[in-house]
């Protein structure tokens, strides 16, 4: 699996046509996932309950797609175990993120939640056993500098936000585990099958947590929840899951940084949250990084 991923990245991401479509799918998946925070804010249920409905509404469609994809064949026991483990990581990630975002500033939650990007980049370097050089190194620098500009202005360190900050950080760590497990299981499972199994595991965990926290479960307005299931779970996670085995954790980590940039734009459009010149420049830096990471690169120096 690792050898396959490394060879793809070294050859500019795969055969040209497949590589382009796979990278576009990875970006489109992250853009769809970016809308999730906006829709969670619009939902009239509790935060964990909205995550439950995201899964529950999407699940019948995911299972139908998985059945069609697999022809009704039962996956291997090992694949089911790995996909189920990914589902546990993802459910706990959603719980930590949705609760944490209510106990800290949005900028803090976004900053700490996106530690998954840094962790995936570090893991990608560890797997390759080589330091990034050339365009790849510049892309990493631009991506994280741009994200710091996007989130740094509104970030605030305070004891009042400690619990929320720690929960958001935990969410980022859990999401890293989810991505790596899904990337692993995609070596043996098709995308909808892997996503369907992980989603089945998520549903009872999220419902049980929402009930334990005494959240409002039943919505009055279904529109935000239906859109959340469509954009974040079916489209966003569907595209992400399909593209995962085609790229290294390093590339996947960098594309995750699209999410805070798009979230800032969505906040401006939906809630009138101001975007200053620094925010715009930070978004442009992230965009430039995504272009550079696809350019041919010199062979990196061994670690």
Region spans (language model):
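Loop-to-transmembrane-helix transition segments
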Residues: 21-31, 53, 72-96, 138-141, ...
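Transmembrane alpha-helical segments that form core, pore/gating elements
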Residues: 38-39, 62, 120-126, 140, ...
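C-terminal-most transmembrane helix of multi-pass membrane proteins
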Residues: 3-12, 54-55, 153, 221, ...
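Loop-to-transmembrane alpha-helix entry segments
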Residues: 77, 81, 110-113, 129-149, ...
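Hydrophobic transmembrane alpha-helices of multi-pass small-molecule transport proteins
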Residues: 62, 66, 84, 90, ...
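Glycine-/small-residue-enriched transmembrane alpha-helix faces in small-molecule transporters
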Residues: 2-52, 85-88, 96, 157-184, ...
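Specific alpha-helical transmembrane segments that line the substrate/conduction pathway
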Residues: 49-60, 98-131, 136, 171, ...
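Helix-helix packing/entry segments at the starts of transmembrane helices
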Residues: 109-115, 181-202, 233-269
């Amino acid at each position: 699996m690792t050898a396959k991923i490394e060879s793809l990245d070294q050859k500019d991401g795969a055969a040209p046509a497949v590589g382009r479509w796979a990278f576009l799918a990875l970006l489109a998946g992250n853009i769809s996932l970016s809308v999730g925070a906006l829709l969670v804010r619009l939902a009239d249920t509790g935060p964990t309950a909205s995550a439950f409905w995201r899964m529950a509404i999407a699940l019948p469609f995911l299972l139908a797609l998985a059945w069609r994809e697999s022809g009704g064949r039962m996956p291997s026991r090992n694949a089911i175990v790995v996909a189920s483990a990914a589902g546990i990581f993802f459910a706990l990630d959603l719980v930590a993120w949705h609760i944490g975002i209510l106990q800290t500033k949005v900028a803090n939650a976004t900053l700490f939640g996106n530690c998954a990007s840094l962790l995936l980049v570090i893991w990608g370097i560890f797997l390759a056993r080589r330091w990034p050089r050339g365009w790849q190194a510049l892309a990493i620098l631009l991506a994280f500098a741009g994200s710091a500009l996007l989130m740094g202005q509104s970030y605030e360190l305070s004891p009042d936000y400690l619990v929320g900050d720690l929960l958001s950080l935990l969410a980022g760590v859990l999401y890293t585990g989810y991505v790596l497990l899904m990337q692993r299981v995609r070596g043996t499972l098709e995308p909808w099958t892997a996503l369907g199994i992980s989603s089945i595991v998520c549903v009872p965990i999220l419902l049980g947590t929402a009930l334990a926290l005494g959240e409002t479960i039943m919505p009055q307005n279904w529109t935000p929840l239906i859109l959340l299931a469509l954009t974040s779970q079916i489209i966003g996670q569907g595209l992400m899951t399909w593209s995962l085995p085609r790229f290294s954790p390093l590339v996947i980590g960098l594309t995750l940084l699209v999410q805070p940039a798009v979230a800032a734009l969505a906040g401006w459009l939906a809630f009138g949250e101001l975007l200053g010149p620094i925010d715009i420049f930070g978004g442009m830096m992230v965009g430039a990084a995504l272009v550079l990471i696809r350019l041919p690169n010199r062979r990196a120096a061994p670690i």
